[in-house]
Amino acid sequence: MTKDNKTFEDRLDRLKAIVSALEKGDLPLEEGVALFKEGQTLSKECATQLEKARNEVKIVTGGEVEDFDVDTEEDTADDS
């Protein structure tokens, strides 16, 4: 699969795997740096894809896109 054919989810899954590997802290320096660089690239690509999706939603909704709050487990625990 070429880079251009990867979905947002593919990139996000790879980014999560990279973060997990880096958090373990047992990689050789060179491998850690290479993974960090790959992660930076993936992060930028995901941000670009999200911005494109947001712009598409703006077009479909006539420019009326409102931000919304996403309840997290912490948010719902704080409400109790």
Swiss-Prot record:
This is Exodeoxyribonuclease 7 small subunit. Keywords: Cytoplasm, Exonuclease, Hydrolase, Nuclease. Its EC number is 3.1.11.6. GO terms for biological process: DNA catabolic process. Belongs to the XseB family. GO terms for molecular function: exodeoxyribonuclease VII activity. It is an enzyme of class 3 (hydrolase). Its main location: cytoplasm. Bidirectionally degrades single-stranded DNA into large acid-insoluble oligonucleotides, which are then degraded further into small acid-soluble oligonucleotides. It catalyses: Exonucleolytic cleavage in either 5'- to 3'- or 3'- to 5'-direction to yield nucleoside 5'-phosphates. The keyword tRNA processing does not apply. It is found in: Cytoplasm. InterPro entries: Exonuc_VII_S (IPR003761), Exonuc_VII_ssu_sf (IPR037004). GO terms for cellular component: cytosol; exodeoxyribonuclease VII complex. The keyword Nuclease applies. Heterooligomer composed of large and small subunits.
